[in-house]
Amino acid sequence: MNSLQVKICGIRSINSAFAATEGAASYIGFNFVPSSKRLIEADAAKTIVRAIKENYPDINTPKTVGVFANQPLLYVNSVAEYCELDMVQLSGEEPLAFAEKIISPTLKAIKVDTSAPWESELRRLDQLAKLAKRLNVEVILDKYDPHLQGGTGQTHDWQLAAKLAEHHSFLLSGGLHPGNIQSAISSVRPLGVDVASGIETDGKDDANKIGRFITDAQAAHVQIYN
């Protein structure tokens, strides 16, 4: 049985980054979307990335991910290189082909439109997931919101997500937190999960919640597959 991939996003402090590392998170994300309340400056992100490498030289540390949305290619690549990031996540309306121009391995947020007819939306998502696989792009399944970029913090149709998971691998995102993560994993059975608002207290990333979320997510995964 493969372990569940867990992405802790919106990291803004070294303590939270260390909590994610010690909890064996698969990824930690830094948000560079200007409109996001989790925006981090490149210098601060670089400091955290280096602190992880320096303080945990003997373990497999999480892959560091920069989150961008509808930002110029030159900017995306420059920040990824400057911050020494492992990966880039595209969370806007960028076409999947945009990922071919990114200097780092790429994640792409595919958005679920809960107002669309169920069958047609499933077909659309299936086509996007197939294209992502051909381009070696990992998929994050999030909820569509025309007013929010870089993560919505809203749950979407887990039944549709479960149907998509029968044929495609992706990280489930959108409104996850310690209180619903077991239900999300048992309902959808995704490759992994992605969380930001669900590990915050008063709008700030919370090291204790990060540890609890990872533990609960992995426990739910083990319970399903054992």
In which residue ranges do the predicted regions lie?
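Basic, often amphipathic N-terminal segments
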Residues: 1-56, 86
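Glycine-rich beta-strand-to-loop/alpha-helix junction loops that act as flexible
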Residues: 9, 67, 91, 173-176, ...
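Generic hydrophobic/aromatic pocket-lining and core-packing "Φ" positions
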Residues: 17, 45, 76-77, 99, ...
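Conserved, mostly hydrophobic/aromatic
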Residues: 20, 88, 139, 157, ...
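Glycine-rich phosphate-binding active-site loops on the catalytic face of alpha/beta enzymes
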Residues: 25-37, 89-98, 144-145, 188-211
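Conserved anion-binding
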Residues: 32-36, 49-172
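C-terminal helical cap(s) of enzyme catalytic domains, especially alpha/beta-barrels
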Residues: 41-52, 99-101, 196, 200-226
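A C-terminal functional module that forms or caps the active site or interfaces directly
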Residues: 165-167, 171-189
